């Protein structure tokens, strides 16, 4: 199965007709996690930048090991392809699909790929906020970013989606930005481990929000900033949140502290 967007197909010297065409692409390697059976490349077509994620069979041994550890194995590009489409339906800014393909039905041996347009003139929130502790941004600018991240997270969780790697480095802010709400464009990336279902279990909401909290700890956020996030995420007054969500808040704190001790795993 091969799908190409018309724009991407028109830019190719010859259209891709099989998975081998994607695996033959040469480009700048961005990621190649050891033992993960996937790699990410950046390449250009007609002067436009694209990212290509290649997946190949992880083998039944690896699949069973993950399942026995109560972890869902990433066995192909289909998950990211579906996640990008779903986020688009929900109005959550993310990557733009250019191509997708899959070869074979056996999850232990199949090969697949997904191509997305490069998000040009963007910076990760991790880099954008790196000096906030020493050089705080304008109050309104910070509040808008916090509210946007909280609203995006709320929309995911209320629609049966959890990210599993929800760190501020996976939010890309379009540049330049003048601090206004109407010009704020924040894209969520790295969706290959996203889970899609009817309802997100509490433990996965805790993991997402705890991961966000951990990754923002060094940005100089104040107690009021955290309260702002909670108000938008829960869509409730603070009094109600503290009365009804105490267990959730303690679990989020525990998750964040655990990550602080051991660091972010390279999944």
Tell what function each PLM region has:
Residues 1-16:
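N-terminal positively charged amphipathic segments used for targeting/anchoring
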Residues 15-126, 136-137, 154, 158-159, ...:
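Conserved ATP-binding subdomain of kinase catalytic cores across diverse folds
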Residues 47-49, 183-186:
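Short, mixed charged/polar active-site loops
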Residues 105-110, 176-185:
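Short, solvent-exposed loop/turn segments that connect beta-strands within catalytic domains
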Residues 132-144:
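Activation segment of protein kinase catalytic domains, centered on the conserved DFG
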Residues 142-147, 153, 164, 169:
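C-terminal structural cap/anchor segments
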Residues 166, 170-178:
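Hydrophobic residue at the +6 position relative to the catalytic HRD Asp in the kinase catalytic loop
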Residues 184-257:
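C-lobe/activation-segment region of protein kinase-like
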């Amino acid at each position: 199965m091969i799908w190409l967007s018309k724009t991407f197909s028109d830019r190719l010297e010859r259209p891709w007709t099989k998975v081998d065409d994607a695996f033959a692409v040469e480009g700048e390697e961005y990621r190649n996690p050891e033992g993960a059976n996937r790699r990410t490349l950046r390449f250009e077509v007609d002067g436009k930048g694209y990212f290509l994620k290649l997946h190949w069979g992880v083998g039944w041994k690896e699949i069973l090991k993950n399942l026995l550890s109560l972890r869902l194995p990433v066995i192909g590009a289909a998950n990211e392809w579906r996640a990008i489409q779903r986020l688009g339906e929900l109005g959550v800014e993310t990557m733009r699909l250019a191509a997708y393909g899959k070869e074979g039905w056996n999850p232990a041996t199949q090969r697949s790929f997904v191509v997305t347009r490069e998000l040009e003139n963007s910076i990760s929130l991790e880099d954008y906020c790196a000096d906030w502790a020493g050089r705080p941004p304008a109050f309104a600018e910070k509040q808008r970013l916090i509210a946007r991240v909280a609203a995006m997270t709320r929309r995911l969780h209320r629609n049966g989606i959890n990210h599993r790697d929800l760190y501020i480095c996976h939010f890309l802010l379009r540049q330049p930005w003048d601090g206004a709400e109407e010009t704020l464009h924040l894209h969520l990336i790295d969706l290959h481990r996203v889970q899609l279902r009817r309802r997100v279990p509490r433990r996965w909401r805790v993991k997402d929000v705890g991961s966000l909290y951990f990754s923002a700890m060094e940005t100089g956020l104040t107690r009021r900033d955290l309260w702002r996030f909670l108000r938008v995420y829960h869509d409730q007054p603070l009094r109600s949140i503290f009365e009804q969500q105490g267990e959730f808040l303690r679990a989020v704190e525990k998750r964040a502290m655990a990550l602080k001790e051991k660091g972010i795993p390279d999944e």
